[in-house]
Amino acid sequence: MALLVRAALLGAALGPACAAVHFREEFTDGVNWQRRWLNSQYKPDLGKFKLTAGKFYGDPVKDKGLQTCENSKFYAISSRFKPFNNKGKTLVIQYTVKHEQKIDCGGGYIKLFSSNLDQKNMSSDSPYYIMFGPDICGSETKKVHVILNYKNKLYPIKKQIRCKVDGFTHLYTLILRSDQTYKVKIDNEMIESGNLEDDWDFLPPRKINDPTVKKPQDWDDIAQINDPNDVKPEDWDEPEHIPDTSAARSKDWNNATDGEWRHPMIKNPLYRVRAGTIFDNFLITDDEEYAEDFGYETWGETKDPEKVMNIKQTEEEKKRERAEEEKHFRERLNEKVEKKKESGKNKLRRNTVQKEEL
């Protein structure tokens, strides 16, 4: 899944030498967001978005954003803004993303396109200038993408930048400066920086392989081999089927006649694309300080209350689960008591019959 944000990086030069805000979106005006954002119609089965603050939040209005709401779907939505030219200026791209579903596999990244993008037919094949944001899939992929278009060719950053993998809202910021330096920030804290020429393969390498050198005959190309002494841990758990925790016991289920109820088994989805990601607080500007302040005014003010609400909900859920377990325990205990009583009555009847026969 990828949220594709429509951007225009070509056009008229900027005017005043002050902070320029090219795009800002907080989704605080209710349904009016639908006038500014357009779902791609490239495929009929693309997933849809809804406006919500999610299951837990710091503020019911400020934390509203676009949420993916269909599992195992691809998503594409875009918003248009006035073209601009960032030549000689800093470019700051910033937004918040929350994987409240504790995602197994899916992207939370955005893309910036040219002004000639066909929004209705936008797809993964649509050319773009910049791709930025987190991408998660299983235990192997938990990284922040920074892909830049240079001379119509896409170049990913060579460094590995780890993204946040919890279920809370996080602020992602990309800063590209005119002096060829960059910064990547998460939650307004710098996690990576450097020089564009060093960390992307835009230019030919300064050194190349010597074509006259030949590989020795006894050269071993295998960098790693399987450890023959390694064995799978005894507690390794990767069953083919797992309980369906979303299933509920029917009201007419009777443990005495139907047996103890258990969750039905389903195939184990090791890495499945789950919906629930929320995108919010988009900002494109040329001012680093403005972006940092905007981040604190939005994400910064609601991040702590969001965690408090989540903790409260978790505690309440645990109480409900304990109450349900106690209820089932009492039901099973009562059933056993009733069975013993019935068994005692049957034994008494047999003894009475035997005495009468004597």
What are these regions (language model features)?
Residues 59-62, 67-154:
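Secretory/extracellular carbohydrate-interaction modules
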Residues 1-12:
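Classical eukaryotic N-terminal signal peptides for Sec-dependent ER targeting/secretion
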Residues 183, 271-279:
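Extracellular carbohydrate recognition
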Residues 31-65, 126-132:
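Extracellular glycan-recognition surfaces and repeat-rich motifs
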Residues 189-270:
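Short, solvent-exposed beta-strand-to-loop segments that form ligand-recognition rims
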Residues 147-173:
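Short, aromatic/His-centered strand-loop micro-motif at the edge of beta-sheets
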Residues 168-183, 187:
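Localized edge beta-strand/strand-to-loop motifs within extracellular or lumenal beta-rich domains
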Residues 11-43, 296:
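Extracellular carbohydrate-recognition regions
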